[in-house]
Design a protein with these regions (language model features):
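Periplasmic-binding protein-like
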Residues: 209-218, 254-282
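Conserved C-terminal helix/tail region of periplasmic/extracytoplasmic solute-binding proteins
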Residues: 335-365
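Early extracytoplasmic/lumenal segment of secretory-pathway proteins
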Residues: 24, 31-104
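A ligand-binding cleft/hinge motif common to bilobed small-molecule-binding domains
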Residues: 101-104, 242-259
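Extracytoplasmic ligand-binding site segments that recognize negatively charged/polar headgroups
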Residues: 47-54, 91-92, 96-239
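Mature extracytoplasmic/periplasmic domains
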Residues: 279-339
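Bacterial N-terminal signal peptides that target proteins for export
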Residues: 1-11
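C-terminal motif of bacterial Sec signal peptides marking the signal peptidase cleavage site
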Residues: 19-22
């Protein structure tokens, strides 16, 4: 199911990115491409999260361009990163990854700088989409969807005590203790404490992260669970009254219970992005660029909004889909400017090991 995209993420990124940093980097310049290439003579293998694109996407792309497309699935960023960094040709032409992972791939010379002359639909993107810290100007990646993390809660069960701060989640009022969940994936496990303490979501400072750990350990006794997969269901049933949640996932709960609401805490949050990249080893780079350009079409991107309930940084797609959704799912109306007030997640490099160690120590039984 499509929502397994984030749920399956694990703390394996730490060791992986540490290994990546130790590898030697190759030239990351773009390969010269032929704008008149016969795309019917090229084939594409694309790796994406399951159910994260329309089922008929390969057939429609082949009908338009003559290029046969095979879409394979990965469950996590870590899974596809392991495949792409194993050495040799992975056989993948285009991969969908989160922004900070694209940054790591680019640093190791494993993905192409994009030829923007072949991606005219970049013009559909909001200007804010070119201002993200992991890839300013979208030099080597093109955004597919974006969002933020906040508190998803049952307004009917918290009347008069609606959360406004990360501290409301970490140190809830006595009547809500044991009815709160936090995300287990390490970057998002750290986020509430980082923001509550006034730190960056990308901090690599050991002293700051020590304070983050102390706050998370203190908060642990207030939790029902660390939960990446069923937190919105817990809200629906009333088992939980307040959970840390990705905005799109909160929408899955809202779809089942209109008493569920979403708020970005006053201390701020993150801005996460899923992107498309072209592998250096691809022998079908013109078709790969055509595929990315096709994905940025209004109708393809509006499918993401309508079916995944995530925002996309695509102006005509949001203009097409938002009016019918924003009434039921108010967080879909968070503007690009509002999103950009939050921190874009970046690759932590060697500091990933620090995050992994703290996550392990905090969540250990």
């Amino acid at each position: 199911m499509r929502i397994s995209r984030k749920a399956a993420a694990t703390t394996a990124i730490a060791g992986l990115l540490l290994a990546l940093t130790a590898c030697s980097s190759s030239d990351s310049g773009a390969t010269a491409l032929d704008p008149n290439a016969d795309l019917s003579k090229q084939t594409l293998t694309v790796s994406n999260w399951a159910a994260y694109n329309p089922d008929d996407l390969p057939a429609k792309f082949e009908e338009k361009f003559g290029t046969k497309v095979t879409i394979t699935n990965h469950a996590t960023n870590e899974e596809i990163m392991a495949k792409l960094t194993a050495g040799g040709d992975s056989g993948i032409d285009v991969a969908f990854v989160s922004g900070q992972f694209a940054q790591a791939l680019s640093a190791q010379g494993l993905i192409e700088d994009l030829d923007k002359t072949l991606i005219s639909n970049e013009a559909n993107l909001y200007p804010e989409a070119a201002k993200l810290a992991y890839d300013p100007g979208n030099k080597y990646s093109m955004p597919y969807s974006w969002g933020t993390t906040g508190i998803c809660y049952r307004a009917d069960l918290m009347k008069g005590n609606e959360p406004t701060s990360w501290n409301d989640l970490l140190m809830p009022k006595p009547q809500y203790k044991g009815k709160v969940t936090m995300l287990a994936t390490e970057r998002w496990l750290m986020l509430p404490a980082q923001k509550a303490l006034g730190f960056s979501a990308n901090t690599q400072d050991e002293a700051e992260m020590g304070k983050v750990k102390d706050l998370l350990v203190k908060a642990k006794s207030n939790l029902l669970a660390y939960d990446d997969t069923t937190f919105y269901e817990r809200l629906v049933t009333g088992e939980a009254v307040m959970v840390e949640a990705w905005d799109g996932w909160c929408n899955y709960g809202i779809a089942k219970n209109k008493n569920i609401k979403f708020v970005v805490p006053k201390e701020g949050s993150d801005l996460f992005t899923d992107v498309m990249v072209v592998l250096k080893t691809s022998k079908n780079k013109e078709a790969a660029h055509a595929f990315i350009n096709y994905i940025l079409d209004k109708d393809v991107q509006s499918w993401v909004v309508d079916n995944i309930l995530y925002k996309v940084p695509n102006i005509p797609a949001m203009e097409k889909s938002l009016p019918a959704l924003v009434g039921d799912f108010p967080n879909m109306g968070i503007t690009p400017a509002e999103l950009l007030k939050n921190e874009s997640l970046v690759d932590l490099g060697k500091a990933s090991a620090l995050y992994t160690r703290i996550a392990t120590e905090v969540t250990a039984k």
